[in-house]
Amino acid sequence: MAAQAAPAEELSKLSVEETKPVSAAANGNDSNAESGDEEGEEGTTPAAGAAKKKKKRKPRKKKKAPTSQSEPPRVLVSQLFPNKQYPKGEEVEYVNDNLSRVTNEEKRHLDSLASNQEFLTDYRHAAEVHRQVRQWAQKSIKPGQTLTEIAENIEDSVRALTGHTGLEEGDALVAGMGFPTGLSINHCAAHYTPNAGNKMVLQEDDVMKVDFGVHVNGRIVDSAFTVAFNPRYDPLLEAVKAATNAGIKEAGIDVRVGDIGAAIQEVMESYEVEINGQMLPVKSIRNLNGHTISHYSIHGTKSVPIVKSNDQTKMEEGDVFAIETFGSTGNGYVHEEGEVSHYAKRGDAAKVDLRLSSAKSLLKVIDKNFGTLPFCRRYIDRLGQDKYLLGLNNLVSQGIVEAYPPLVDKKGSYTAQYEHTILLRPTVKEVISRGDDF
């Protein structure tokens, strides 16, 4: 774990006082000391003579704060933006009936007020951390790496850039990982991260979804991309990226989520990919959805389908949405399968009288370190907890903690994912996680 860097405002206070000069004799340099023969001249002693020849040291220059990110990322983002003016996301005007919002004076005033709210600064801070970490990850992820290495590289970087290692009680609730790094390969579409002892290695022919969240004060930025090294999968990745952008374009205040799903599906399923001489259609995974994001909760109350539906739920001003799409060369439908790694405490969990002592103690750890933020077993491990699985399973069975098993399509198929977080501001939608990469 990288050492925490000092904030820029603290660095600016660390001006170095001019060092008091030290005599050459005091430094052990006898050649510059006055000789004993001069002692009688004007009553000057050798020490006094030496004092006359004190050398002034040049004042040390103040250490400059970093102005660019390191590789791997270890520089606090707050140091790179000491005035907290973090970059805005992509601002997109509303279409059709919502165009009037841009010229409405009252709406502009409300948007100005919203821009000053602390939550927007926190969101942009989290988004900048996500951008810097993922852009490095896209360059650094290579075949031959273990999934554990990839996940820990991303997570260490997020913690370094937010300045919160998450090892002190409550520290991870201030800022850091919004949810565990998902590294779902090939037919596995979501909710896979390595548990302790996992030896899985990324292969040249794999298609891996990289899905991780960053939060600052509970404002979660959720964004994902897909890594593939074999160019034959390019049409699959292009289909999903284009479908996500279609969903973002369609999204807006008063827009029905069913219409967004139709727009996503139309784009997604216009693509096909050739694998082993066979042309395969790209299908939207119909039982996976986008969703709203709430304070300290990755899944809010609204969902955004990625296929056409009759869902009449409307997006509303002030909503925060994760627009994510999944494409598959398989059935276009996922089911739960495999060892669980992702968990989250339920926000609506009823109070239960726990009889198992290990469950009681683990719940305290979860409350103090994660709250309702999702976590994985590796996060519990790094807090020094052991022999907790029985207690964790008990919390799941009691309905206090939700388990999220891996979601998979049929074996032999390939899946891809792209995702952005958007804010529905009064006059524009801000694609808060947009970057030069996607």
Curated annotation (Swiss-Prot):
Pfam families: Peptidase_M24. Its EC number is 3.4.11.18. Binds 2 divalent metal cations per subunit. Has a high-affinity and a low affinity metal-binding site. The true nature of the physiological cofactor is under debate. The enzyme is active with cobalt, zinc, manganese or divalent iron ions. Most likely, methionine aminopeptidases function as mononuclear Fe(2+)-metalloproteases under physiological conditions, and the catalytically relevant metal-binding site has been assigned to the histidine-containing high-affinity site. Residues 10-20 have a biased composition (Basic and acidic residues). It catalyses: Release of N-terminal amino acids, preferentially methionine, from peptides and arylamides. InterPro entries: Creatinase/aminopeptidase-like (IPR036005), Met_Aminopeptidase_Type2 (IPR050247), Pept_M24 (IPR000994), Pept_M24_MAP (IPR001714), Pept_M24A_MAP2 (IPR002468), Pept_M24A_MAP2_BS (IPR018349), WH-like_DNA-bd_sf (IPR036388), WH_DNA-bd_sf (IPR036390). It is found in: Cytoplasm. Substrate binds at residues 191, 299. Keywords: Aminopeptidase, Cytoplasm, Hydrolase, Metal-binding, Protease. SUPFAM superfamilies: Creatinase/aminopeptidase, Winged helix' DNA-binding domain. A divalent metal cation 1 binds at residues 211, 222, 419. Its cofactor is Co(2+); Zn(2+); Mn(2+); Fe(2+). One of its GO terms (molecular function) is metalloaminopeptidase activity. Gene3D superfamilies: Creatinase/methionine aminopeptidase superfamily, Winged helix-like DNA-binding domain superfamily/Winged helix DNA-binding domain. GO terms for cellular component: cytoplasm. Residues 51-65 have a biased composition (Basic residues). A divalent metal cation 2 binds at residues 222, 291, 324, 419. It is an enzyme of class 3 (hydrolase). GO terms for biological process: proteolysis. Belongs to the peptidase M24A family. Methionine aminopeptidase eukaryotic type 2 subfamily. HAMAP family: MetAP_2_euk. Cotranslationally removes the N-terminal methionine from nascent proteins. The N-terminal methionine is often cleaved when the second residue in the primary sequence is small and uncharged (Met-Ala-, Cys, Gly, Pro, Ser, Thr, or Val). This is Methionine aminopeptidase 2. It comes from Sordaria macrospora (strain ATCC MYA-333 / DSM 997 / K(L3346) / K-hell). The lineage of its organism: Eukaryota, Fungi, Dikarya, Ascomycota, Pezizomycotina.
